[in-house]
UniProtKB/Swiss-Prot annotation:
One of its GO terms (cellular component) is cytoplasm. It is an enzyme of class 3 (hydrolase). Keywords: Cytoplasm, GTP-binding, Hydrolase, Metal-binding, Nucleotide-binding, Ribosome biogenesis, RNA-binding, rRNA-binding, Zinc. The lineage of its organism: Bacteria, Pseudomonadati, Pseudomonadota, Gammaproteobacteria, Pseudomonadales. GO terms for molecular function: GTP binding; GTPase activity; metal ion binding; rRNA binding. Its main location: cytoplasm. GTP binds at N163, K164, A165, D166, G217, Q218, S219, G220, V221, G222, K223, S224, S225. It comes from Pseudomonas fluorescens (strain ATCC BAA-477 / NRRL B-23932 / Pf-5). Pfam families: RsgA_GTPase (PF03193). This is Small ribosomal subunit biogenesis GTPase RsgA. PROSITE patterns: ENGC_GTPASE, G_CP. Its EC number is 3.6.1.-.
Length: 343
């Protein structure tokens, strides 16, 4: 069933209600923090944010007698938005509750704009973005390419992961093979696995060990099933595909960090069907298409838009087959979605 479009007034009312709820939550949070800080708090120590729940986060202690234990913490009002993977300074209170007093610098961050166009961090301090897709729901090259642009922009290594490889059949194999061939030709690391049958999971584990990785992808591609296969003791909830839309249903509602016994961490993020890139520039998008790198700056005209201009190096490469039409379509679609001031 198609999603009903909201008019401007309905969107305004929704945003107003959400703003009022956020203000009430912030007031409760401020009161709770004041009460905690008015009592006995332990010394400052470092911690790792492993999950985020509204006005509270779960912090894993990294030092001292409580190292490895998890505490629910409030945030001081002057702190920036924290996400799973953030390293913080915090102080422990009573009954497993604490207060975060500072955020430590991030080595990397994966961001996307929210529904109001405000930049929202998704995960912090990750080494690898694992872009998960599957035969069902049908994979969209444009979404994969958006993740790749975000990865290149953030300086984070991407891994393309086709899950549910056991669902490949005569009907979907041609389109899937054509999709995979594009990324293999570009040199992106790509792995085919089946969390259900266990195929390829040892190779995936080897790639994840020793790294901080984040799973991203649309709902229904089996991210939670992958987590369950990699970490059987976790038992994350798995949801079916919607029988009406063929799209995935959300089972992960907040990004959560898990530890591997052999070293390394994994952040499982909620599934999304769109990934906005309104925070990047046209130049960032062009740099995110790695096959463009040797061609940029070689067009006849310095301000070439790579559309219909004569002497365009990208159009010539497209004509010669050095750039795939699917990738050019994604590039143009992403550019069309950027705000005017990104040009």
């Amino acid at each position: 069933m198609a999603k009903r479009q909201l008019n401007r007034r309905q969107n305004w009312r929704i945003e107003k209600i959400q703003g009022e709820r956020a203000a009430r939550a912030a007031k409760r949070e401020s009161s709770a923090v004041e009460a905690l800080e008015g009592g006995d708090l332990g010394p400052e120590q470092t911690g790792l944010v492993i999950a985020h729940f509204g006005v509270q986060v779960e912090v894993e202690a990294r030092e001292g007698e409580t190292a490895g234990q998890v505490f629910r913490c409030y945030l001081r009002a002057n702190l920036p938005a924290l996400v799973t993977g953030d390293q913080v300074v915090w102080r422990a209170g009573n009954q497993g509750i604490g207060v975060i007093v500072a955020q430590l610098p991030r080595s990397t961050e994966l961001c996307r704009p929210d529904s109001r166009g405000q930049l929202k961090p998704v995960a912090a301090n990750v080494d690898m973005i694992v872009i998960v897709f599957a035969p069902m729901p049908e994979p969209h090259a444009n979404l994969i390419d958006r993740y790749l642009v975000a990865a290149e922009h953030a300086g984070i290594r991407p891994l393309l992961l086709l899950n549910k490889a056991d669902l490949i059949d005569e009907q979907n194999a041609p389109a899937l093979n054509a999709l995979l061939a594009v990324y293999r030709q570009l040199g992106y690391p790509l792995l085919e696995v089946s969390a259900h049958h266990g195929d390829g999971m040892e190779q995936l584990q080897a790639l994840l060990d020793g790294r901080i990785s984040v799973f991203v992808g649309q709902s229904g591609v089996g991210k939670s099933s992958l987590v369950n296969s990699l970490l059987p003791e976790v038992e994350t909830r798995v949801g079916p595909l919607s029988e009406f839309s063929g799209q995935g249903t959300h089972t992960t509602t907040t990004a959560r960090l898990f530890h591997f016994p052999g070293g390394g961490e994994l952040i499982d993020s909620p599934g999304i069907r769109e990934f906005g890139l309104g925070h990047v520039s046209r130049a960032d998008v062009e740099a995110g298409f790695i096959e463009f790198n040797d061609l940029l700056g070689t067009c006849r005209f310095r301000d070439c838009k790579h559309d219909r201009e004569p002497g365009c190096a990208l159009l010539k490469a497209l004509e010669d087959g050095r750039i795939q039409q699917q990738r050019m379509n994604s590039y143009r679609s992403i550019l069309a979605s950027l705000p005017d001031n990104s040009y």
